[in-house]
Amino acid sequence: MQRPFKSLSRSLRQPFNRLYAQRRLREYHSQKRTLDEVVDWAMNFGGGGYMAVKTLQIPGEITRLAQAVQAIKPKIIVEIGTARGGTLLIWSYLASKRVIACDLNDMHRQRPLFSQFPPPESHCQVTLLSGNSHEADFKARLARELNGEKADFMFIDGDHTESGVEADYNDYKEFVRPGGLIAFHDIVEKQPLPTNQVFHFWKRLKVGADVQEFVADPGQCGFGIGLLRVPEA
């Protein structure tokens, strides 16, 4: 009986969670924000249930990445691994035209919230794609959404196994323009879970490449961001 009761409890709380999220979003949009403020909101937006906005990031690391992305004045951003939408809030602030957010989980409940992330003065549109990034059909859906355009920045934060992150990189790097940026999360060697294996792929990928690493503490467990600049054509 615990599972049905838990599901019922969540359903009963959902209207209140939605109202809270809408109030927080109005507060967020009540004034123009600096990038530092947007990162702070991404870390502390809060909420409950499906309407909770969270990000598992170290503030200093994600801020440095966001600054690097801001410097290239991105029009289009693609994110693989949206989860609770915290980083999506940041990308929606930075992209001038479009953010395509991809996640394994169904995001239809979050759509009314996530689609309103861009600032009121922005022309950015948010598209949510739910599905398995390792499936050919999903790649075809993303290709149709881009319709021949290239992303300026791609954030890969989905499958954390070595083979999974390598597959995401190899399958989707073609959608990033020459000179664009691709970032990976959880690149440090010491990780809390054995399935967090991004370090092993990143160690191979960065050899001879134009990369930056944003790591708050070399001895930390988990986190760390690797940034790769795509070679110019």
PLM-predicted stretches and their roles:
Residues 51-56, 60-233:
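S-adenosylmethionine/decaboxylated-SAM
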Residues 1-47:
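Membrane-proximal basic amphipathic "stem/tether" segments
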